[in-house]
């Protein structure tokens, strides 16, 4: 009976203690979660397109006589190029720039999102 209590309750009590700190009275540590062999090395393509193009535009100013700004080389929506901000600012900027050309449902959903974020930012956060 005492052995069962010690193995059940004692194990739960000392389960969080690191292996190096356990005393020998608790028994041999379990080796269930410990890896005994090294995992096989991952095969990684070091010259895929993303890695090959990393840093390709870093010297565009030096080599290109500073004619192009790096933000002009960014691909993506026009309202996001070379700009950063939170979601509310991003939605307001999108509505201002392309709101007149959006479908009615998309514009309605964007306006709903702006209303929700406006309420959220005014009720929660550090600067209320």
From Swiss-Prot:
The keyword Ion transport does not apply. InterPro entries: Ribosomal_mL51. Pfam families: MRP-L51. It is found in: Mitochondrion. One of its GO terms (cellular component) is mitochondrial inner membrane. Component of the mitochondrial large ribosomal subunit (mt-LSU). Mature mammalian 55S mitochondrial ribosomes consist of a small (28S) and a large (39S) subunit. The 28S small subunit contains a 12S ribosomal RNA (12S mt-rRNA) and 30 different proteins. The 39S large subunit contains a 16S rRNA (16S mt-rRNA), a copy of mitochondrial valine transfer RNA (mt-tRNA(Val)), which plays an integral structural role, and 52 different proteins. Interacts with OXA1L. This is Large ribosomal subunit protein mL51. It comes from Homo sapiens (Human). The gene is MRPL51.
């Amino acid at each position: 009976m005492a052995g069962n209590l010690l193995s059940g309750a004692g194990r739960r009590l000392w389960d969080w203690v690191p292996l190096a700190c356990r005393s020998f009275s608790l028994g041999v540590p379990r080796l269930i979660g410990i890896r005994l062999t090294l995992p096989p090395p991952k095969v990684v393509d070091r010259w895929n397109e993303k890695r090959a193009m990393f840093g390709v535009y870093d010297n565009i100013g030096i080599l290109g006589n500073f004619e192009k700004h790096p933000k002009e080389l960014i691909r993506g929506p026009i309202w996001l190029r070379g700009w950063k901000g939170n979601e509310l600012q991003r939605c307001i900027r999108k509505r201002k720039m392309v709101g007149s050309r959006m479908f009615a449902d998309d514009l309605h959903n964007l306006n709903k999102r702006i209303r929700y974020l406006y309420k959220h930012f005014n009720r929660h956060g550090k600067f209320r």
